[in-house]
Amino acid sequence: KTGDEALLLARIAPTLVCRDRPAGARWFEAMSDPPSLIIMDDGLQNPSIAKMLRIAVVDARRGIGNGLVIPAGPLRAPLETQLEIVDLIILNAGPFDAGRSETDDTPGPDVQADLVAFFRDRGFRKPILRGGIAPRNDLAALRGQPVLAYAGIGHPERFFNTLRFGGVEVVETVTYKDHHLF
């Protein structure tokens, strides 16, 4: 039994869902053709596996929220602790589109620059990269077509804007809770 994210990832790479992270890593290592790289989601707080590279992906629109730890805020550990162990930060923006619409939630360059300054002010001197989501060519068949878009993800506007950026005519949106069972 697993969630939708693992099933989507399994379409493009060997994927394992395992509560016991070290056991999962050993499973990959025991494969006849083991991967040279293992990517863990939410692995920063797990000290049981040695890591070669720790990457923090930060939503460029939301930043770090109120800066507090769960349940008072969105962080899983204090920011100072995370910045000490992270090797690289990626500011994840929405679709790259110079002509954003008024409803697009993609942060402009000034918002991303503010985040870079924010992390630099806290002593983070390692690389900070800017990334984003770009639609794949699969959207070609939908371009110019009226579409009802529905999503059961944490921040559905980013998905809807990706469709719009890809040329899809989104006439209506329906939003469900994150990980909704369709």
Task: Describe the role of every protein-language-model region.
Residues 31, 99, 121-122, 127, ...:
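Generic signature of intrinsically disordered, low-complexity segments enriched in small/polar residues
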Residues 139-182:
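Redox- and metal-dependent alpha/beta enzyme cores, enriched for Fe-S-associated oxidoreductases
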